A protein has these predicted regions:
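Bacterial N-terminal signal peptides
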Residues: 7-15
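Sec/Tat signal peptide C-region and signal peptidase I cleavage site
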Residues: 15-21
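Non-catalytic cap/lid and distal C-terminal segments of serine-dependent acyl enzymes
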Residues: 22-301
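Positively charged n-region of N-terminal signal peptides that target proteins for export
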Residues: 1-4
Length: 301
């Protein structure tokens, strides 16, 4: 059955040469038994073809349409992740890395919320979240974070590790996202600490409901985190936020997360980073400008 699954995937694969010998493999409809099929772009560093014996760490990134190409990104401004990684690797500042850009769907809001935190929400908060999801085009009506992670770990990562020369252990497997994508990246590392050794969460949308006067959803997530904290001895986390736009409301929430992480044994500027970027807003342009910081934390030599 697995052979049929992988063979089917290869039928959808399109190899596109990117700048300076990087290669992007696009799978237009990556199938899943847990969530709707979606596009996945897999960027191989130029070192991949240069040394056939070398294996590479892998970074799984959310909102994949905004990760690599300006043409597919919101407001035509991507994170420019591939070129940033290539430049840093060429300067010997980071290890070369495979980037897996996972496109979102209309179920984004439900897929990216840390599902186990929902048990600490009120019925009214859950109802409001379902209404928000509807405005985004989702008709599912249930939280989908656990199923999304099953897809990520049990299907996508299996395919990537089978198809490419990856370093498969947790130490070399990281996950990254912004806003709600930051929440699911944290959740992935907490739910699957044996799979993801590092998580980078930019402009993490702790308030969830876009209401800075209601702190309960943020508290619900922290309750979950406190009960499921990965061991600090072999995990690393990066958090940040700006001070403009939507990011202006994140500071108090992030400070409480910082306190929780430090109480749990994480060491600031060692295996834990928390940063504030003055004036940065809640958009791809801002995340693009500081993505090098993320890569240096995850893969710096």
């Amino acid at each position: 059955m697995k052979r049929v699954f992988f063979a089917a995937l290869l039928c959808f694969a399109v190899f596109v040469p990117a700048a300076q010998a990087q290669i992007v493999q696009t799978i237009d409809h990556f199938p899943s038994q847990y969530v709707d099929a979606r596009r996945v772009d897999i960027l191989l560093p130029k070192e991949y073809e240069a040394d056939k014996n070398q294996r590479f760490p892998v970074l799984y990134m959310q909102d994949g349409q905004n990760v690599l190409s300006d043409e597919t990104a919101m407001d035509y401004t991507s994170w420019n992740a591939g070129n940033t990684a290539m430049d840093l690797a060429a300067q010997k500042e980071i290890k070369p890395v495979i980037i897996v850009a996972i496109w979102n769907t209309s179920d984004r809001y439900l897929e990216y919320f840390p599902e186990k935190a929902s048990e600490y929400l009120t019925d009214d908060e859950v109802k409001e979240m379902m209404e928000i999801a509807k405005t985004g085009g989702s008709s599912k009506g249930v939280f989908m974070g656990n199923d999304y992670l099953k897809f990520l770990v049990g299907e996508l990562k299996v395919y990537v590790d089978k198809t490419y020369r990856t370093l498969t252990d947790a130490q070399n497997t990281a996950i990254c996202g912004s806003s709600m994508g930051g929440l699911i990246s944290m959740y992935a590392a907490f739910e699957y600490p044996e799979v993801f050794g590092s998580a980078a969460c930019l402009s993490t949308h702790w308030p969830v409901l876009f209401d800075e006067n209601n702190t309960n959803p943020s508290e619900a997530i922290r309750k979950y985190m406190e009960l499921h904290m990965p061991p600090s001895k072999n995990h690393r986390f990066y958090f940040d936020h700006g001070t403009g736009g939507l990011d202006a409301m994140y500071g108090p929430h992030q400070e409480q997360v910082d306190q929780l992480m430090l109480r749990s044994g994480y060491l600031k500027d060692a295996n834990y980073a928390t940063r504030v970027f003055e004036g940065a807003e809640h958009n791809e342009k801002s995340w693009r400008q500081r993505f090098d910081e993320v890569l240096l934390f995850l893969y710096g030599k």
